[in-house]
Amino acid sequence: MMGNKSVTKTMPGLLRSVCLLGLAFSASILHATITVTLSASPASPQPVGMVITWTATVHDTEPGTHDYQFSVGPANGPLAIVRDFGLARQLPWAFSKTEGTYQVSVIARNTSNNTSAQATQSFVATSRWNGVDAVTPTANPLVALFSGPPCVVGNRVRVRFTQTGSSVSQITNAIACNAKKSANFYIGGMYATSQYRMHHEIISSTGALVRKGNDFTFNTGSIPAGITFPAVTVVTPAQPPSSKTAPILLHDYLGYVPAATDLSGNVLWYYQQKVGQLTRAEAGGKMLMNNSHNPNLYYNTLLEVDLAGNITLWTNVHRINEQLAQMIGPNGQPRRPVNQFDHEGRRLADGNIAVKASSEMMVTNAAQCGTDSNGDPNTCDVIGAQLLILNPNLQIIWAWDAFDFLDINRPANLGETCVQGDGSCPIFFLAPTANDWLHANAIQLTPDGNLLFSVRNQDWIIKINYSNGTGDGSVLWRMGYQGDFTMINPPTSPLCTTPDQQEAYQWFGHQHDANFEFGGESVLTTFDNGNLRIARCDTNGNNRGYALTVDEANRTVTPILVQDLGSFSKGLGTAEVIPGSPNYHFENGYVEPGPYSRSQEITPQGATAFEMDSAGVLTYRSYRMRDLYTQPPPL
C-alpha cells in the first residue's frame, strides 16, 4: 500500500496570475492608500557588474507589515521575479551579463489589509569593453569580471584563464555571441594572492576555435582574516587521469562558508556567507543554497548565487506557503504548508527548480504513535516531505506531498524522533516531539521525465510519476529494503543470517545522494550510510559506496560496486561518478570520533585512488568538478 493517490492541481488561473508578478489582489488596489518609490545607489548609468542597491520606500496611511517583491528585465521586455515577497526593502543587484537599458520593479504590499503599490525604474548599464577586453575585481577577492568583445552571431564566446607559470588552464562556459554587445563572465577557480592570464576565445557552433584574444593579467587578493576553513590532511594523493579531469572539490562545510579547493585542500573559491546547505552547483557558475531552521518563515530561504557572491534568485517559505494555500490538494482541500527548505535544491534541464521542503501533520495512528491503555491509537506529530517544482519566476508549478502518497502505517524503520531545537531535524511547530518519518534528502529528474527521491528513514529510493509536469504523483516503484526490486548476486555477511537481516545487509540504508549516472537510467549510485544494516546485524559496520545496474522493467538490480569505505558516517554523504573518469567519488560527511569528513575516490575494482580528510567539520555534500562552470548533462 502506498497511501492515497491524488493529483495535485493548481487553481484555475493561478499560474496566469503569478507568472508576471506573483499577485492575486482584488480591484481595491486601485484605491489603495499605499504608495512606493524606488531608488538606486549609485545612480544610473554604471558599468556592467557594478552592484546597485535598490531601495523601496513605502508611504502608507494604514498600519501593518510590508513585504516586497523585486523583478528585473530589459527595457520594454518581460520582467522576471528575482526576489519574491520578503521583508527586506533593499535589493542588491548587478547587471552582469551585458550592457543595455534595464528596468527594475518593486511591489510593496501591506500584509495586514492586502493593499499594494508598484514602482518601476529604468537603469543603464554601460559596457566595460571599449575596443579592448577588460578585467575588473569583484567583492570576492578570488573572482574577476572579464568583459570581452561583440562577436559574430552563430558563434560562441568563452574565457580561458591560466595561473602565471602554469600550463594548466581552465575555461568558462561558452555563451552565444552578440554582434553589438559585450560578453561578460565571472572568473572563478583561482588561488589567492596569485597572478592569472586570461583571454577570450571565439568558437564555432561545432566547438572549433575561430580566434582568440590577447592575454590580460589579473592578481587575486587575500582571503579576509575572518574567513576560515577546516584543516585538511591528504591521506592518498590524487593521480591522473581523474586528478586532471576533475581537479576541483566543491565542499558544503557545515558551520563554515562553502568552498572549492584543489585536491590538496588549497582554496580556489568561497562564498562569503555561511548558509544552511549548498545543495547543487549549476552549469554556468551558479549555485543553489538554502537557509533553514528559522521559525520566522520569511527568513527560511532558497537562494541562487553567482561566483562573485551576488544573490541572483531568492524566495522564502512564507511566500511558498501563500502559493500552496491557493493550490488544490487531496479531497479538494488547500495544500498543506511547509516548514522549511532542506536537503535539496536542483536546477532542471528545462530551467525549473526542484526543491525539497519539510512539512508536518498531527496523526492518530497506532503504527506511528502507539496505543493507549485501551488499545486505541494515540495522536502524535509526524514530519513529512514535499517535493516542489518552481518555474524560473519562483512560482510553484507542481507539488507532491508524501502524506498523500506514502503509507503512514510504515513508520521510520529505526523509529527516529525529533525534539525541538535538534539541528539534525527539520523545524516543526505542532508538538514538543515529532516522528522523523522520512528525512528525504535528494531529488533527480530522470531521462524519462519522472523524479527520483531518496527517502532516508524509509531506506528507500522511490520513483515518482512526474511526467515532465503532467504526472499524477503516484509512486512508480520503491527500491531498497522491503521494496519492489530484487538484487541479483547480493552482498552477504556471516553476521546477518535471518531473512530480514540478509535483506537489510544487501541493500543501501539511510542513504544519501541517489542519482542515475551517464545520462541514462541503467546505472545508479548512492551513499550507503548503513544505519539499518548496522542496527540489524552488521555490528561495527562501515559506510559503503554503491553502484548498481538497474533493470526497471524486471525490477532487478545487480551490484557493480559495493565498497566498504572504512569509516562510519551516521548521516550526510555524497556519491557520484567522477567526470571524465570511471572512478567514483564518495563523501563521508560525519565521521566519528572527531567529527571529521572524508573525501574518497574509489576505482571500479575497489581501490582507493584519493583520500582527503577535513578536520573538525561536517560536510553536507561535496562534488568533484572539472571547473566551476561545467556540470554533467543536466537530468
Where in this protein do the model-derived segments appear?
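Short, solvent-exposed loop/linker segments at the N-terminal edge
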Residues: 44-50, 134-138
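A short beta-strand segment in extracellular, disulfide-stabilized domains
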Residues: 50-58, 143-145
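Extracellular acidic, Ser/Thr/Pro-rich low-complexity tracts
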Residues: 56-62, 74, 110, 148-153
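Solvent-exposed loop segments of extracellular immunoglobulin-like
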Residues: 62-69
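Short beta-strand segments within Ig-like beta-sandwich modules, predominantly Fibronectin type-III
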Residues: 80-88, 173-180
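Surface-exposed, short loops/turns at beta-strand junctions within beta-sandwich domains
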Residues: 94-101, 187-195
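Histidine-/acidic-rich catalytic cores in large beta-rich domains
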Residues: 127-161, 175-184, 191, 195, ...
